[in-house]
Structures are given as C-alpha cells and as structure tokens.
Swiss-Prot record:
Pathway: Pyrimidine metabolism; UMP biosynthesis via de novo pathway; (S)-dihydroorotate from bicarbonate: step 2/3. PANTHER family: ASPARTATE CARBAMOYLTRANSFERASE (PTHR45753:SF6), ORNITHINE CARBAMOYLTRANSFERASE, MITOCHONDRIAL (PTHR45753). One of its GO terms (biological process) is 'de novo' UMP biosynthetic process. It holds the Pfam family OTCace. It comes from Stenotrophomonas maltophilia (strain R551-3). One of its GO terms (molecular function) is amino acid binding. The gene is pyrB. This is Aspartate carbamoyltransferase catalytic subunit. Keywords: Pyrimidine biosynthesis, Transferase. HAMAP family: Asp_carb_tr.
C-alpha cells in the first residue's frame, strides 16, 4: 500500500495508512503541522487560501463528529469548498456503489476526498479507482487505519515530551484488538523510533497477531505504568461487554481505569492522551480527563493543524 500512496518521485499522493511510510515523510508532515499550530493559522480569522478554487468532499459511511468537523474546518481554513456527503441520504441507498459516487463527484470537479468506511481496505480500493490528480485521505476504515489520528497523536507527544522520540516510554491501554487508532499509533511509534512501547489490556482485548511485535505486553496496569512518559488510553466500545469480552464496565474501570492515584505511578508530568469520545468513569476519571496532565483537548486542536498539513501536502 506504501507504493499506492506515493507517486514515482516519492511524493505523497494519497494518505491511506502510516504503515510503511518513510520516517522522513512522517516528520515532514509533523513539522508542517507544528508550524501551522504554532502560527495559530488554524484559528478563525487567520486563513491561508492555498486551496482556493479546490473542492474537498467528506465521504463518510460511518458516523463521526470530531474527525469530520476537524477536516471540514481544515479545508475551509485553506480556502477550499467543502461538500459533506452523508451515506444515509445519498444515492448509495438506491444502490449506487462507493466507486460510482466517487467518480460522479470527480466529474463535478472534486479533487480531494476524505473517506471514513466501516470495512478494512475500503479507502484503498477507492484510491485504486480514483483518477489522476485526485487525492484520498483515510479518515478511518474498519480496524485497520486512521492515519491523521496517528499524526495528531505523534504531534501531541512531541509537544508534551520534546522532539526526541527515542527517549520516550509510551503505554497504550485498552481494547487494542479492535482499535484502528492503536494499530495506527503503533506503526507511527515504531517508525519514529520510540524508545519503549508498552501495551496493556485484558487478554481478551489484545491481538494475537504481529500487531504487538517488539512491544512490552502485559495485563497488569499498575506495573505497566511505572516510569512511562505518556499514556494513550483507548475507548472501550460498549459492544465488547455485550460480546462477553469484558465482564462489566465497573470491573474494567477497577483494573484499567486511569485515576489520579494510578497516574502518580507514571513518570513525572506523564501526558495523558485519548482519541475520544471518552467514557468518563470507565477509561479515565473526571479528575484525570480534566486535570493538568490531560492533553486530550490539545489533541483535538492539533487535529485541525495536522489535517491542514495533509490537505496542503496532497492538494496544494
């Protein structure tokens, strides 16, 4: 898939996954996003019109609030016209395929597509069907990838703990097995050379494939917290309880919920990240979510800057 994302000169053509992308490409995107964020270009009233005259479509086949809104703001602040496609009210309900939808919108002059889909590989399949000069961005597909979330998480880590990823110890906590965010972050952490990657969660929620290769893996949260610089807490999907993978929300919180008492075991000023939406009282307490070590809202703010950087790189 790496070759599919890059053109013959090595320039990014689509952003489908972080897996296999060169370290230099990730750092270039992070550097550009950092410049945008530092200059406060991502704020209302301070726009860069590099995409004026271009059209971007958010093509979402799954519900989303933060990701869709973030991409919409990013595109608008670069001067693009934005179309919001809603599968529930579109011609796909009449039998039109996603590829036909893409081609029809291309014919109208849309150059950029931000796609979320419930199926693994669906965005890559659309990229294969896209015409020359059209760019696709994966806004989350199945369990496999959510590249802009991974980039904004890496930008937040760099802001919180400095530019030297090799000195960081990071723990990912929760339902790694079903999480596209976790898989994406693991690819990014490895590519950027993070010193130690720990993964913690119930055995029923940890993958048994190559996903965790090279990671320190365990189910004792208190032990895994010792000396970490950052914690990446994952959302527990309620359906996991219905599937019997988690006995109860209360028991999950007792074993894997982040409290101030547990946070004290981590390294000094350890940063707390969460992709949202947060289940308060399950993954984290109110005190942690709203506390001084929470970087959650800064992740959200960084998301706009990251998505501006990606859109600018692909379409600018």
């Amino acid at each position: 898939m790496t070759a599919q994302q890059l053109d013959a000169s090595g320039r990014l053509r689509h952003l489908l996954t972080l897996e296999g992308l060169p370290r230099e490409t990730l750092l270039q995107l992070l550097d550009r996003a950092g410049q945008i964020r530092d200059a406060a270009v991502g704020r209302v009233g301070n726009k860069r019109q590099v995409l004026a005259g271009s059209a971007v479509c958010t093509l979402f086949f799954e519900p989303s609030t933060r990701t869709r809104s973030s991409f919409q703001l990013a595109a608008q602040r670069l001067g693009a016209d934005v179309l919001n496609f809603d599968a529930s009210t579109s011609s796909t309900r009449k039998g039109e395929t996603a590829c036909d939808t893409l081609r029809n919108l291309e014919a109208m002059g849309v150059r950029g597509f931000v796609v979320r889909h419930p199926d693994d590989g669906a965005v890559a399949a659309l990229a294969e069907a896209a015409g020359e000069g059209t760019a696709l961005i994966n806004a989350g597909d199945g369990r496999s990838a959510h590249p802009t979330q991974g980039l904004l998480d890496m930008l937040t880590l760099r802001q919180a703990k400095g530019p030297d990823f090799s000195k960081m110890k990071v723990v990912i906590v929760g339902d790694v097995k079903h999480s596209r965010v976790a898989r994406t972050d693991l690819h990014a952490l490895r590519t950027l050379g993070v010193g130690e990657i720990r993964v913690c969660g119930p055995q029923s929620l940890l993958p048994d494939d190559e996903t965790l290769k090279g990671c320190v893996v365990g189910d004792d949260f208190d032990a895994m917290l010792e000396g970490v610089d950052a914690l990446m807490m994952l959302r527990l999907q309620r359906e996991r309880m219905e599937e019997g993978l988690v006995p109860s929300l209360e028991q999950y919180h007792a074993q894997y919920g982040l409290t101030n008492e547990r946070l004290a075991r981590a390294g000094k000023d350890a940063a707390v990240l969460h992709p949202g939406p947060i289940n308060r009282g399950v993954e984290v307490t109110d005190e942690v979510a709203d506390g001084p070590q929470s970087w959650v809202l800064r992740q959200v703010a960084n998301g706009v800057a990251v998505r501006m950087a990606v859109l600018e790189t692909l379409l600018g």
